[in-house]
Amino acid sequence: DLRMSRGLGDVYKRQELLLDEYEKLFSTRTRLVSVAHVSNVLGTINPVKEMIATAHAHGVPVLIDGAQSIPHMPIDVQDLDADFYVFSGHKVYGPTGIGVLYGKETWLDKLPPYQGGGEMIKNVSFEHTTFNELPFKFEAGTPDYIGSTALAKALDYVSAIGMDKIAAYEHELTVYAMNRLKEIPGMRIFGEAEHKGGVISFLVGNIHHFDMGTLLDRLGIAVRTGHHCAEPLMHRMGIEGTVRASLGLYNTKEEIDALAAGIERVSRMF
């Protein structure tokens, strides 16, 4: 894979990806670029279209993790020219335990099945096995009918609202939240890209993120605490974890005001 650990500090100066530094990481050993479309810690929207073009110029395929982008912005995998694009169901208001893998047909044809079972085999004998056509060769056994139906309904729901409308509304909320939270004494926000997603990670003074999250929960305010499955990034920033507020299409400015008031109330306890 791309040796991101070698140059993470250079690539992510200012907590935004630098394309010229990114290109320096390619070598003859690079086999796949795997990158998040939107950071689930910083909210940074990575320039994946340009990253894909660079990788393809080196003959390297690209997998985009779209878990943090699919619910929040329009996505056109053909325009991006992504070889693979993946996302989880629950991030887009669907059920847990299900997700989507998009792949270019040329790549999916090359890849072997990762599971064996009913429907993924066309013919089988003791001497030879012929796998089924796409997409069935990757769908062994009884499918998750309930999960797939619920996920399809969730995608229909956000599509009916309009992804452009969702993106514009959430950007307005994010700008409002960033400005409001910066007014709080001792506030440190991690990830301040100009065009970022609605993910705001922060610490306040010397208050431990677990303490802040627990007390906000007592006030009826839902946030996430910890390293958010991004422990190497936390080490790079010299912290153990953050409090993370995540904005969605259902949030309001009044709720952001309640979050800010809750943080201020908790801060007075320390």
Predicted regions and their residues:
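A short glycine-threonine-serine/GTX helix/turn-capping micro-motif
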Residues: I121-S125, T130-Y145
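Active-site phosphate-binding strand-loop segment of PLP-dependent enzymes
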Residues: R14-A67, P71
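Conserved small-domain helix->loop->beta segment predominantly found in fold-type I
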Residues: E139, V158-H208
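Hydrophobic beta-strand scaffold residues
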Residues: R6, V62-L63, I189, V223
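PLP-dependent enzyme catalytic core of the Aspartate aminotransferase-like
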Residues: K24, A152, G213, R218-A222, ...
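Active-site PLP attachment segment
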Residues: D79-N123, E127
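Single conserved hydrophobic/aromatic residue that forms the stacking wall/gate
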Residues: D1-Y12
